[in-house]
């Protein structure tokens, strides 16, 4: 049985700041060697050349080592950064750590009640020619199943959030594929971000039984195929799929629980509230921010501009805008909607949601404190 989880959200005060992680460790909230995953937002451009993700990654790993975690162990900790804090979104990190068994007393002791659990896995290496094709779907699906097993989850219905980081295509990797006589799905590096995310989401959906195995032709074209729990990011930092499965399991113990839902479109506040309720908070029929009473740890969303250029029947110009890419516009929009619900702009809102939730909407996961 996996260990119980402690999870906290902390602000990031500057690009290279990890002082709040250090404070959590110094205050005894968690131990450096027990940190198992970090998921956060950095303030870069969110694109191919967003190096704030690399800077933040280094800062957080250095703190873990400074506070006593073995360097080799720290190298293996999955740290997923989503670049781009457009609009009111505030840079932050959500940190997951295991709890020593001796600390699980009273209401926190393991029981039949489902509580938060986390599992991690890495896929086989993803070659540039795999990205956007069924080879990638298969490799991701295999890694998701391993992460589920490590989280102690046997029923896919108990998986509420799968956060991934996968490689996108760069000029260098495209050149590499061609030198070996291979082709790539696209030679547009920015488009490959959407491609990598979408293909990864299909792998998650296959692993969890949400869809049957799609064909190469379905990738990015059949938007009726999607996962309701996938949250996929991509970058230049790695050549494998990094998979973090977050769900609930009995017998784990602890004080936290996770739930999920989907936003049907960019304005669907109800979808966010449904995820919070699904996590276990008892809320009124028409809840307000004040009803959360400090019990919401964080929400995690993916968003996407609807392919028809409409929101609730009204036309918008995001997909035609040559000045500001639609990635930044929809992220800013949904970030504002989300912060209005939670009352906190430190929310994980990430763009590029192909095959992640319905077209124009996206998955929502919420972690709450039931302690």
Curated annotation (Swiss-Prot):
Residues of the active site: 165, 233 (nucleophile)
Broad EC category: hydrolase
Catalyzed chemical reaction(s): barbiturate + H2O = 3-oxo-3-ureidopropanoate
Annotated residues for binding of Mg(2+): 304, 353, 356-358, 361
Activity-regulation annotation: Inhibited by cyanuric acid.
Domain topic, free-text comment: The monomer structure is formed from three repeating units (RUs) that share the same structure as one another. The monomer and the active site possess nearly threefold rotational symmetry, to the extent that the active site possesses three potential Ser-Lys catalytic dyads, but one of the 3 active site surfaces varies in composition suggesting it is involved in conferring substrate specificity.
Protein's recorded name: Barbiturase 1
Originating species: Nocardioides sp. (strain ATCC BAA-499 / JS614)
Source species taxonomy: Bacteria, Bacillati, Actinomycetota, Actinomycetes, Propionibacteriales
